[in-house]
Swiss-Prot record:
Modified residues (N6-carboxylysine): K124
UniProt remark on cofactor binding: Binds 1 [2Fe-2S] cluster per subunit. This cluster acts as a Lewis acid cofactor.
Principal EC category: lyase
Primary role: Functions in the biosynthesis of branched-chain amino acids. Catalyzes the dehydration of (2R,3R)-2,3-dihydroxy-3-methylpentanoate (2,3-dihydroxy-3-methylvalerate) into 2-oxo-3-methylpentanoate (2-oxo-3-methylvalerate) and of (2R)-2,3-dihydroxy-3-methylbutanoate (2,3-dihydroxyisovalerate) into 2-oxo-3-methylbutanoate (2-oxoisovalerate), the penultimate precursor to L-isoleucine and L-valine, respectively.
Active-site residues, record numbering mapped to chain: S515 (proton acceptor)
PANTHER family assigned to the protein according to its UniProt record, in alphabetical order: D-XYLONATE DEHYDRATASE (PTHR43661), D-XYLONATE DEHYDRATASE YAGF-RELATED (PTHR43661:SF3)
Binding site for [2Fe-2S] cluster: C122, C195
InterPro entries according to UniProt: Dihydro-acid_dehy_C, DihydroxyA_deHydtase, DiOHA_6PGluconate_deHydtase_CS, ILV_EDD_C, ILV_EDD_N, IlvD/EDD_N
Annotated protein name in UniProt: Dihydroxy-acid dehydratase
Family note: Belongs to the IlvD/Edd family.
UniProt keyword annotations, A-Z: 2Fe-2S, Amino-acid biosynthesis, Branched-chain amino acid biosynthesis, Iron, Iron-sulfur, Lyase, Magnesium, Metal-binding
Subunit structure: Homodimer.
Protein's pathway: Amino-acid biosynthesis; L-isoleucine biosynthesis; L-isoleucine from 2-oxobutanoate: step 3/4; Amino-acid biosynthesis; L-valine biosynthesis; L-valine from pyruvate: step 3/4
Amino acid sequence: MPTYRSRTTTEGRNMAGARALWRATGMTDGDFQKPIIAVVNSFTQFVPGHVHLKDLGQLVAGEIAAAGGVAKEFNTIAVDDGIAMGHDGMLYSLPSREIIADSVEYMVNAHCADAMVCISNCDKITPGMLMAALRLNIPTVFVSGGPMEAGKVKLGDGEHALDLVDAMVMAADDSVSEEDIELVERSACPTCGSCSGMFTANSMNCLTEALGLSLPGNGSVLATHSDRQNLFKRAGHLIVDLAKRYYEGDDESVLPRSVATYDAFENAMTLDISMGGSTNTVLHLLAAAHEAGVDFTMQDIDQLSRRVPVLCKVAPAKNDVHMEDVHRAGGIMGILGELDRAGLLKTDVSTVHAPSMSAALNEWDVVRNENHHEFYRAAPGGIPTVFAFSQSRRYRELDTDREAGVIRSAEHAFSQDGGLAVLYGNLAEDGCIVKTAGVDESILKFSGPARVFESQDASVDAILSGEVKEGEVVLIRYEGPRGGPGMQEMLYPTSYLKSKGLGKACALVTDGRFSGGSSGLSIGHVSPEAAEGGTIGLVETGDLIEIDIPNRTIHLAVPDAELAARRQKREEEGWHPAEPRPRKITAALRAYASMTTSASRGAVRNI
């Protein structure tokens, strides 16, 4: 029978000092025999996805106390990728994932907490906390802050739904008036919550449902809706139950590593492919699997991508569909239900809230059970706000149309080819990733001359000045985990290509990564990266690059002898950008670069 970890600090004569300190936090004699639950919050006023979390930790804490536990809250950092985008701030985004994971480990292990509720939301916070949960392997429940409502704006022929990416694209389009840009800017992000499309934050929060570590609705209930309050309350009660089942009942099935097994990771990736999730999820799932000791690799993702269809298209792949629409169609449990009916889901895996995924789907899939139809009718309020649970509006009816609705059955899939693909070839021997759900069918096969840039900044200048021409492959290198360092997101280059009318006329290839808001023929995570001696570091402007998504290949059409000669020269001169970059690399970033690994391994640390 496992012993409560917290008893290390609450029992025995030699812990009198520790108990004295616990008492100073408000604990009483009766509390020392209760499970101590860490409430891992990530409130910050810098990030709209986290601005409303300030009081939610204490909401969970109150429920933990009511259920017989003791809650102790602390905070992690949280970087807003949208605000950090387009300047050196983005160098810190991916490294913050490791800092978050470490900070959770430090706090939980230093104070011997028995279990955790992780209150996350945005891009690197959910992955960082997920890595920590699997590293620590103590009972854990995830509950996120929830998606933002989609913006609404009246332009031209009527009202349009929009999001952050629309504002970025329009701002770079010279044909759009200053007045319209201001209107879109003021309308794109109307409420608190994670950005409203299937970007990285929402993708990861959805995947926690598939992994079995969060409650149904975690990925799709709007931040503003009162139904999300119930998720926080239920999480508080659930975590105490899980802690008692483990420490008092020796039930190891509730532990994160027992829930997030290889099959669960397959389910999560299957979901991601079926809904065209962010390519960043590949990076984060690989890192989480590493922490869990699960042998889940790029090769597994490649195999899944070849047999999982696209059942749901959400912005940026489909501009008029946002997370509120996914929820109305049955949320993540609705998509998982369709995957199950197609024979693509492992349903004997356990979850924190149900004995199996099969049992969870029997209860929460709107097609097979009407018990929670009201829950999935939760609608946006349409009123700008920074407050959680501020409205209770509901749609009159659900979207259960599986032929032409937001969520499709496998028979009526948007595409039988999955929403993500892994490409291999001499340009990416260890693989690279493309979000096929955002690629127009006309350019699934694409060949063109490379236009090489040694940084994201240089590519942006060239795109905006009109130097990049139709048919070219924009190649941005030395932006990988080590070369950046920090593996910047390339949302600005992809957005600016769209604004210049080149979204379907050019490709973009990089050893960096892409925002979940990116679309078009955007190929990232090229591995090995340039800074590690990857072939991407040998490409010269004018070289022909051949991309074949249906056959999963990417090829640099340069003779092997020429590549060998270029490699010898590069080995002599060093693997670094050919042109100097005005980029300040601090000691913190240098430390990250010295330990990080390739994107094909999830950019985990090699220590």
